[in-house]
Amino acid sequence: MKMSLVLVGSILIVNGGNLPSSSADSQHVPHQVSSHTSGDKSQHKRMAIIIDDVGNNMKGTAEILATPVKLTVAVMPFLQTTKKDAIAAHEKGMDVIVHMPMEPKKGRPEWLGPGAITSNLTDEEVRDRVEKAIDDVPYAIGMNNHMGSKITSDKRIMSIVLDVCQERGLFFVDSRTNFRSVVGELAVTKGMPPVGNDIFLDDHNSKQRIRKQMDLAAQRALDKDVCVVIGHVGHTGMNTSAVVHESVSRLKGQIEFVGIGDLVRDVWHWKPELKLPTDNK
C-alpha cells in the first residue's frame, strides 16, 4: 500500500496521522553542561547546525541546502525525497545523518512515519529497522532521533540502536528530547562519542525567538568552544533558514560553522570505517 504524506497547514500527515518535529516532543533541552569542550582553548569556536525533518519536500529545504557554510541535514528514511535530499546535501559538502523516527512518550506511533522504532518491537525487529533506515539514506555518517522521548530512555532498545550504528561506523547524536535519556551513558560504555544537542533553535516559529536561540548558541560556542544546535524544515523551515543565513553572515570571523562529523572526529577522535551498501555511497 502506498503511504501518503502531505503537508496540511504546518504539520505532516502520514496515513491520517500527524508527524510533529522532535522539538515538539521535547519542548526544551535540559540545561546541562555537555562534554563538547576539548581543552584546546586556542582552537576555533565552532558550531554544528543540524537541520531535522529533511526528506519529504518540506518548506525551507531548498533554502537550507543553499546555505553557504557546512551544515548537517538529518534525513528521514523512506520518504518521497529522502534520497534526493541526501544526495543534494552531500554534493554541496554537507554532512548527512539518518533522522530515525522513534516513539515519544505522548502521541500515537502512526504519527512517526514509516520504519519507526517503537517500544513493542523485539530486539530483532529493532535491529532490522535501524539497518534498513541506514541503507535508505545515502551518504549517512551518523544518526539522530526524530521525537523519541520514550525510546531514548529505554536501555534495551537504545543499546541495540547504538550497536547497529557502531557496527556500521555511524555515531549517534542524542537530540535530547527527554532529560532522562540513556543515550549518552550507553555511548560512553560502548566507546562511542556521547554527542548531543545543546539548543533547539525553533521551538517557537518566530524569527525573533529563533534569533534569540541562535544568540544563545553563539554564546555557548564562544564560552565552551563548541555548540550543537538543532533546527527544522517544515513548519518553521522558512524562518529557520532565514535566521541561519543571517547568522552565518553576522557571526563570520567569530564562529566557524562545521558539520557534526567534524566535531565528532576532532573532539572524540571518532574515525571508524563506514559500512554502507554498495548503492548507498
Language model region names:
Residues 11-49, 55-63, 265:
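N-terminal pre-catalytic segment of deacetylase/amide-hydrolase enzymes
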Residues 40-110:
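Active-site beta->alpha N-cap acidic-glycine motif
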Residues 47-52, 71-75, 94-100, 143-145, ...:
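Hydrophobic faces of well-ordered beta-strands that scaffold small-molecule active sites
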Residues 48-50, 54, 70-75, 113-122, ...:
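Second-shell loop/turn segments in exported
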Residues 111-112, 116-135, 152-157, 184-221:
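Alpha-helical scaffold elements lining the catalytic groove of polysaccharide deacetylases
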Residues 131-151, 222, 226, 230-232:
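Active-site groove signature of glycoside hydrolases
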Residues 165-178, 236-281:
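C-terminal domain-boundary segment and adjacent tail
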